[in-house]
Design a protein with these regions (language model features):
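N-terminal cap/lid segment of alpha/beta-hydrolase-fold proteins
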Residues: 1-9
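Post-His helix in hydrolase/transferase enzymes
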Residues: 256, 272-282
């Protein structure tokens, strides 16, 4: 569905719809991604009691309007959306950048629960990734999946040719793949490229530099008073190289140990790498 806000037409995907739900759950995507991550997170066991939504932030997916360049601006966008939907005390599940947005919202209004998934704070982004994101989105995706994915599920394709899940989108020349988003070389391990395609396709956006904007927003974000967080849980990947768990971080100071989950043999994208385990945890 689409909801008119002051400066945006917000796209919100409804996973289900019930009257008088116990909770309203919002899945907030990470940098460069959109509502499609919701299709990889099985929340169906909650459909009888709760409404589940996945949303697109401006510049992502189907939401139109001016691009937002800071976590605070994206937080305000979500607050406006919640008010327009007449929803109070939401449950927010934020992945990576989405976790920072959930954190910022939870410091500004009451949330029933905020789940920060693969979100470190502060979330600093290396200069190499920032440069890739600005000039070559495919190279940024390569970096994200190379260092972010530990457990690669096998993807079965129905034909021998690469691109059966998006034929025509790519052009190939001596192992180099060219797309509207940049270039990459898959000569070393073409099977891995096929296996990670279901994840990489989530980064394809009409705004080619949206990943760059998002990553800069993550690096720049500083919460007003991290000691005031409440009703917050954390999910980390044991093998995550992009957002590592730091037990001494102040963000965990007021969180009980039972509300911090470390997923074994999982990197930065648990909804892709270990979806069944993630579903049970959530």
């Amino acid at each position: 569905m689409f909801i008119e806000l002051k400066n945006h037409k917000a796209h919100v995907f409804e996973h289900n719809k019930i009257e008088d739900p116990e909770s309203n759950i919002f899945i907030l995507p990470g940098a460069g991604m959109d509502h499609r991550i919701g299709s990889m997170i099985d929340m169906s066991q909650l459909y009888s009691s709760s409404n589940v939504f996945s949303l697109d932030f401006p510049g992502h997916g189907f939401t139109t309007g001016e691009v937002l360049y800071s976590i605070e601006e994206m937080s305000e966008f979500l607050i406006q959306l919640l008010k327009k939907m007449n929803i109070e005390n939401p449950i927010l599940i934020g992945h990576s950048m989405g976790g920072l947005i959930a954190l910022d919202v939870s410091l500004k209004l009451d949330c029933k629960l905020s789940i920060l998934m693969n979100t470190s704070y502060p979330l600093m982004v290396g200069e190499i990734l920032l440069q890739h994101a600005k000039g070559n989105l495919d190279q940024a995706n390569e970096f994200m999946t190379k260092y972010g994915v530990f457990n690669v599920p096998e993807t079965k394709v129905q034909a021998k040719t690469f691109g059966t899940m998006g034929a025509g989108f790519y052009g190939r020349s001596k192992g180099t793949i060219k797309s509207p988003y940049g270039t990459k070389n898959i000569e070393n391990d073409p099977q891995r490229e096929i296996n990670v395609y279901p994840l990489k396709r989530l980064f394809n956006q009409t705004q080619k530099e949206i990943m760059s904007h998002d990553l800069k927003a993550c690096s720049a974000y500083k919460a007003e008073d991290i000691s005031k967080i409440k009703n917050t849980s954390f999910i980390y990947g044991e093998k995550d190289k992009l957002a590592r768990f730091n037990p001494e971080n102040d963000i965990h100071a007021s969180t009980e140990e039972k509300n911090i989950v470390i997923m074994d043999n999982t990197g930065h994208f648990p909804f892709f790498e270990s979806p069944k385990e993630l579903s049970k945890i959530l």
